Structures are given as structure tokens and as C-alpha cells.
Amino acid sequence: MTDASINASMTREEEASLGDYFALLKPRVMSLVVFTAFVGLMAAPIGVHPVIGFCAILFIAIGGGASGALNMWWDADIDQVMKRTKGRPIPAGKVDKGEALSLGLALSGLSVIMLALATNVFAGAFLAFTIFFYVVIYTMWLKRATPQNIVIGGAAGAFPPVIGWIAATGSMSVEPWLMFALTFLWTPPHFWALALFMRNDYDMADVPMLTVTHGRRSTRKHILVYTVILAAFALTTAFTSVGGPIYLTTAVVLNALFLKGAVQIWRRDEEICESDNFKIERSFFKLSLLYLFLHFGAILAEALLKPYGLGGW
């Protein structure tokens, strides 16, 4: 598909609705940002006034949405090619690229300034860095440059609990980085599982995902290796200041299931995968979402129960 045909097909066909502009913010991704940032905020040792806490999470969410809009602006050409993304507002002809850029920039500035005013300058600055990392380092550079794109770029999605912690404390410590590392190590097996059954999409869009550059067999090995590392870290985290019996129980069960799934994926025959439409890979991808949500849910439970002597060790 030529650039001219891509631009022509992205010409606005009708007036955009509020829902179309909201879709630019990647609400599903934003929900993960909101939840992990909230856990980081609540796990902090310094209590935050509910109004300030609400404002902090709101502005972090807006910053995450701004990143999504800028990502869609830059990736409009490949979104048009991929089946998974061609229904997004820009390739669907509902929102102009210029509008997405303007919205993303405006929300970026708003979120950073308001978070700094509502909490502290350190939190605002870290949010600004996160937006920059996701948009410039990952979207504009790494995504189309290397099969390690989501390994390095995954840091952007792992920063929200750190921002939440800083918003509450105004300082840095080891605890938020444990939450960062949990998300950072989770990102590769999560996205590589998606890439296993969406390989053709990435290939057509000329995105060098590991499945495209190294093949599915190599990707399966990488998923297994990263899952083993993730499981070891997740279980070790249970014995740190953010862990406790609730987290340990959750981690044991979830990592047993996740490791089992990774081994199943590693052993899979490609012909069988094609015949059952990557059933196991799709299930593993869905499990990965539950995996991260429940780990952070357990960290949140430990933090909420700790003042009553029921959380932590």
C-alpha cells in the first residue's frame, strides 16, 4: 500500500464523536496505568488526602491518554495496515492526524502541569519523562527499529506506580521500583504472546517484532525464559516491604499457572497452532492480563491491611 493510498483512506468520512476522541486515549491501556499508579500511591508510607489522591490519579490517567493519542498520531500509517488497529479513529477516517497531535500535546502539557501543582514538581517531571519515553523513545524510535522494542520500551508502561509513589511522598525509594520491575519483566511475554497470533499483521506493517525477525519458534523460547525470570522475581518480591502472605499466596498460584502456560507455548507445534487458531497463545495472553492485575491487587491489599496489623510480614 502506497503512502498516497494510506493518506486517502484516512481522510475524514464523518464528524468525530466524543467517543472517537476518547478512543484516541487508548482507554484499555489507560485503565492499567490508572490501577498501577493507584497501587503505587496507596502503597506509599505517607498518607494522601483523598482529593489530592484523586487529582493525582486523574492527571496521571490524562498523561497516559495523551501518550496514547500521540502514539496513534505517529503510528497512523501502520495502524491502517494492521487488522487489529485499522478500526482506530485515525485509520477509520473519524479523526484527523492533526487533531490527534493537538489533543496529545495539549493533554500532555495539562497533565504534567496539573500533577506538579496538585502534588509536587518531582511527580510532574517524572510524568513528563514517562510521556517522552513512550512517545519518542518507544513509538518514534524503538518500535520500528529493533525486535527488542517492547523489552526496552516496556519501561514506559512500568513507570505509573513509580509516579503514584512520588506523588504521595515527593521522594524515591526501592519499593516503587519493585513494582516497576514486576511490570517491566511482565511486558515481553505479554506482548510476544500477542505477536505469536498477530505475526502477519506486524509483518505487513513492517514492524520488527521478534516473531517477524526471528520467527515464532525463537519467540516461544524467549517467552519461556522471560516467564521464568518474571516468576523468580515475583516470588522474591513477596518477602520485601511491599509483599506479605496475601501477595505470596497470589504469586505462588499465578506463577505456577503462568509457567505452565509458557511451557505449553514453548512445546507447541506450528501446524497445530495454525489449525486451532493459536488457542493456547490467546489464552496465555488473556492470562497475562489477569496475572499483572492480581499481583498489583495483592500489593494493594497488603498496603491497605498493614495499618491494622494484617498486611505485610
UniProtKB/Swiss-Prot annotation:
TM region positions: 22-42, 46-66, 98-118, 121-141, 150-170, 177-197, 223-243, 246-266, 284-304
Key word Transferase present: yes
Protein's GO biological process: heme O biosynthetic process
GO molecular function: protoheme IX farnesyltransferase activity
Upper lineage: Bacteria, Pseudomonadati, Pseudomonadota, Alphaproteobacteria, Rhodobacterales
Summary of the function given for this chain in its UniProt record: Converts heme B (protoheme IX) to heme O by substitution of the vinyl group on carbon 2 of heme B porphyrin ring with a hydroxyethyl farnesyl side group.
Record flagged with keyword Cell division: no
PROSITE patterns in alphabetical order: UBIA
Record InterPro entries: Protohaem_IX_farnesylTrfase, UbiA_prenyltransferase, UbiA_prenylTrfase_CS, UbiA_sf
Origin: domain of life: Bacteria
Gene that produces this protein: ctaB
Gene Ontology CC annotations of this record: plasma membrane
Subunit: Interacts with CtaA.
Pathway: Porphyrin-containing compound metabolism; heme O biosynthesis; heme O from protoheme: step 1/1
Alphabetical list of Gene3D superfamilies matching this protein: UbiA prenyltransferase (1.10.357.140)
Note: Carbon 2 of the heme B porphyrin ring is defined according to the Fischer nomenclature.
Family note: Belongs to the UbiA prenyltransferase family. Protoheme IX farnesyltransferase subfamily.
Protein name, entry field: Protoheme IX farnesyltransferase
Enzyme Commission number, as recorded: 2.5.1.141
Record HAMAP family: CyoE_CtaB
Membrane topology, from the record: Multi-pass membrane protein
Localization per Swiss-Prot or TrEMBL: Cell inner membrane
Reaction equations catalysed: heme b + (2E,6E)-farnesyl diphosphate + H2O = Fe(II)-heme o + diphosphate
Keywords noted in UniProt: Cell inner membrane, Cell membrane, Heme biosynthesis, Membrane, Transferase, Transmembrane, Transmembrane helix
